Amino acid sequence: MDNFKIYSTVITTAFLQVPHLYTTNRLWKPIEAPFLVEFLQKRISSKELKNTKAICHIDPSWVNLNASFIRDDMISIKATTDDMDLDAICRISLPLPMNTNDLTAELEKMKRILLDLSEKFNLELIITKEPAYFTPEQTGESKELCIYVHALGFRSNLMECEPQLLAFVDLIKKNGMTLPPQHYIIEPMELNSYSVLPLYMGVDMENFKHISRAFKTSIYAPSLITLSRDLKANPQIFFSGAVHSLSLLARKTLRESISVNSKSFFYRRLTNITPGKLLFIRKYYQQKVNQLILKYQSLIRVTNEYIEFQSISTNLLEMVIKNFTIQVLHEIVEVQISLNENCAMSPELIIDSFFGHTGNQIVVITPKEDSFNQLIVVGNQSSTDEASDTSILHYLSDFIMGSNQVINPNLRQIKAIFEIHPDFEDFISGKKNGKLTRIMELSACLIQLEMEEEDDNLYLNLVSDSFPDFKESFKNVINEFPAEESFFIPEVCHRPIIGTGGSLIQATMRKHNVFIQFSNSFNLPQNKISMIRYDNVIIRCPRKNKANICLAKNDLKQIVQEYDSLQSKTLIRFSSGQYRHILHVNGQKNIIGQIEKNENVYIMIPLKEPLDGTSQLSIQGNDENASRAANELVNSAFGYEYEFKIDQEIDPNKEYEFYNLIVVPFLQIMNIIVTFEKDLITFTFEKDTNENTLTKAIELLSNYLETQKTKIIFKKIIKKFVLGSASSKSNTSNSNTNGNFRSMNNAKSRTTIDNTSQSGASPQRHKMPVITTVGGAQAIKGYIPNTYYNGYGYGYGYTYEYDYNYANSNKAQTNNRHKYQNGRK
């Protein structure tokens, strides 16, 4: 792109220095930028301006600058730039409650760490007595003294510093400004690379949530935005908790449960994406990219040159690439504008026309010349903002049909380039290219579908020499783009939904003019600390009919509910210790998926641990299969349990002793999960645990309880967990696609232990997961050949498709690269 300029909007902030209790004084500078000086002179005197310091960055190459006060201490600056660097000045502001009357002494204790963070990340750390740079939430009247910690600097530096700063502030909050910490501690865990961060986070952050609940530990990790940056330092995850042994165990559990060193990683890059489109994705699609990263536990890294994907399985890799293409690349379009040779455009005209409103979501590419008659505009197919029109057609209309009356009379050609996943070739074009032919018959345009040997995706080109015809054809084309929604329905319900010979599903598809695809997810990867239910149903239709997707989905849910009411359910005794045991076994062997597949049942294991004491786990299927599956699950994934009833509850002020002397050592040394709640202590252990080990564990527990003047009044060992069948009618309410369980106790018979008043922790259950040491096998890296995706995940095993308007609407794309044209001669 040496011969081109790429224009886009840059938004940054100028922070003015305010009265403060402390500042590291690293980035404050006198205001020298001419634009900012001129702007501030309208509000403050020259003398005040001379004595005012600020943190800001205004590049001399920026043009079309605009500024406005966000607050008295903050100025928003918007400009047009031809620099692809997205870094801007930002802030992190954190309230910090104080529990001391000697504020000066406590600030002195904080200075060393703040100075270290400032130097390490090149940031300004400032403490103010009053809220600055943000408006705090109103939480009612509070007499608690509060100060405010602010980090100011470039966004990239803030993202690296953020987990350490959050952990530090959390530590101070919980320790009442007592440094060094007396109760709460921080344990770091260094990762080999930012690329493995999604794997540790888990689907929708469930791994972190699970670890946090289990170990009463707060977890702070780097932002996912860092995945698109070339950061030199290895990332760190921080664990903060009141019990040191639990924080150490939380770190060990997360590291060993994911076991990165024993996994193979698979990579793929999309390299044929233009720099303008890559910049647009980085500026306006980061949130969507983050959602895909968390949903598929896969790296998506968008750079100036390519998009890189990394995953732990080829299946997940292809799924994330396809969904990225649908949800991101499908939504972005490039439009090439060519004028007559005697009509030239200037950079000033382009900036004034496209960036006159500095909030425009658009990228413009022009030759690096003083005048030119061609340019490329990158934007969204349709508006992404309900309050204002952010579609590319809106910007093009203002430019071409605007008041200057220069562009439209001299328009030679306008061409839109859409990037489409190869699987949707027939979906877009229709039977015998009928859809595209109809669009061309309605307005004067040419439509081409192209795919070269080196291309990752299919390209649809829409060409016209008239903007009104182009606009009409553009709308008709995007109306034929696929709209879809994916979700999970238990595989046991698929065949009843489909019906004999596909009769039910065809009726649903015909009724709503959509088509529905089913897949199984039995063999997709699981981990040892969370249960993942992957989407296995897709409803798809042309975008013009997307409202029908919700209607079809509701019909499917109704069929599922009716089927559930006819199914029997086998109940299994279920506890939090067994929940952790099952997750550990399932992460190694995928037991749940295999049983569901072999027995045609649905194991309604919850996605979160049960919190209401001993519960009931349901298995749904026919009488024989559900019962057989229940026994198989208990035999292959359950451990035995020992329950101990004690004569008084464990003293909340002595919980840390119980963790340090019983819970953690028993798990680490004897592989016994110890959970306790109110007056009940439970051991969960492997079935082949040595009898001597159990005897020793019971002896140690008894000895500890004696020191607390507590004794065991009842104990029993539990080896049978299958409770038998439940009537379908009474259990219909438990049929939930996210898993379900029923408490075996009254709601008030088990309570959470809230030790907030003792150590500042939020109310938590006290349960421990199974931990098994994982070997340090070297990672084996596999590479995906540079071929495009060919229909994985939507119907392998069985597929039923029906299109009311056109046959074979989603025929699988073959691997034969081709190029063809369908247009007017």
Swiss-Prot record:
Subcellular localization: Cytoplasm
Annotated KH domain residues: 482-556
Keywords: Cytoplasm, Phosphoprotein, RNA-binding
Stored Gene3D superfamilies: K Homology domain, type 1
GO molecular function: mRNA binding
Modified residues (Phosphoserine): 762
Composition bias type Low complexity, residue spans: 727-740
The protein's name: KH domain-containing protein YLL032C
Source species: Saccharomyces cerevisiae (strain ATCC 204508 / S288c)
